[in-house]
Amino acid sequence: MKQAFRVALGFLVLWASVLHAEVRIEITQGVDSARPIGVVPFKWMGPGTPPEEIGAIVGADLRNSGKFNPIDAARMPQQPSTAAEVTPAAWTALGIDAVVVGQVQPSADGSYVVSYQLVDTSGSAGSILAQNQYKVTKQWLRYSAHTVSDEVFEKLTGIKGAFRTRIAYVVKTNGGKFPHELRVSDYDGYNQFVVHRSPEPLMSPAWSPDGSKIAYVTFESGKSALVIQTLANGAIRQVASFPRHNGAPAFSPDGTKLAFALSKSGSLNLYVMDLASGQISQVTDGRSNNTEPSWFPDSQNLAYTSDQGGRPQVYKVNINGGVPQRITWEGSQNQNADVSPDGKFLVLVSSNGGAQHIAKQDLETGAVQVLTDTLLDETPSIAPNGTMVIYSSTQGLGSVLQLVSTDGRFKARLPATDGQVKFPAWSPYL
């Protein structure tokens, strides 16, 4: 746990201006059918009021996963703070088979000890399924709550939790000298900060696999350029600034390469840069437009969008050569694919009959499932555990971020109050 906090500390961007969070998750569908669970308000062991409501954060995380439906505190049959105080029968009467209890204890040195227990109320009634405690400073209390959520989620589902991840996105604010901002926040919209401000558009942020850098497109020089920015110190490395278009960056999962699209020779084509040497190799060629690369887990193959068949469709190609293989066949056009972390499926923007929605395609069976019913959906990005997708859609006259589970049952939005939000990118595990 101490190592996890040391790693997270490396992502504090001291040079960036911290903002009041402008996005918050608002659930729109699916929580009622999720598994009920009890997340009891954590007992505050100090004077006055607690600096953070840890239990509320854990409950929100589990609800936001789409897999759990924490009951309201008013419906709880009791509010224990330790496993020994839990009365299993009182919870099973409500259909609840697991309860999270915990405490927050202030320390003399100004830090806090957060402890929790996950209690089984049915199978082995009263037994402790998971427990832990963390000593943290005030600024890391939310992080400790997300850590509780990750551990509880993994214990109950067998899937690694992704509550300590972040999202990057571009905001076009309503005026000012620098109306275009690249921002990063916790996955739930809290702890938002500005990575870069620009008078010209910013596009297509992409995380490095260790979460320390973000590649993106900038037009500050009067034309498009690809850059990589280090979050810890703000250092910017220019990667590509060729004539015409430079866009769609994507780090390879092994962190050694960056794929992107260039139109320096006419049509858009895919290129890959070796990040250590700076050497660039061309992957696709021809007169068609090839763009929007997304890596497969082997760091050797790319899914990408091409109009070589007339309309945009998704193809797969090996970066070392070979004949591209078409992946998508349903719908009038498909684009903007993101390959899942395990390489078993992809999510993409699928257009059919004038509608433009996020869809999921199983790469083994080819089965396609439309996940969304929002308007003009764009740029899907999958969470590192493969359970959720964040994307942008049109709402009114602007654009907002939306969430959907990869089974399509859970939906939520992250409305912004100070501008249009586009190009979301979910971070790796941090």
Swiss-Prot record:
InterPro entries: 6-blade_b-propeller_TolB-like, PD40, Tol-Pal_TolB, TolB_N. The gene is tolB. Residues 1-21 form the signal peptide. Disulfide bonds: none annotated. It comes from the Bacteria. GO terms for cellular component: periplasmic space. The Tol-Pal system is composed of five core proteins: the inner membrane proteins TolA, TolQ and TolR, the periplasmic protein TolB and the outer membrane protein Pal. They form a network linking the inner and outer membranes and the peptidoglycan layer. It is found in: Periplasm. The keyword Signal applies. PANTHER family: PROTEIN TOLB, PROTEIN TOLB HOMOLOG. Part of the Tol-Pal system, which plays a role in outer membrane invagination during cell division and is important for maintaining outer membrane integrity. TolB occupies a key intermediary position in the Tol-Pal system because it communicates directly with both membrane-embedded components, Pal in the outer membrane and TolA in the inner membrane. Keywords: Cell cycle, Cell division, Periplasm, Signal. NCBIfam families: propeller_TolB. SUPFAM superfamilies: TolB, N-terminal domain, Tricorn protease N-terminal domain. Transmembrane segments: none annotated. Its main location: periplasm. One of its GO terms (biological process) is protein import. It comes from Yersinia pestis. Belongs to the TolB family. This is Tol-Pal system protein TolB.
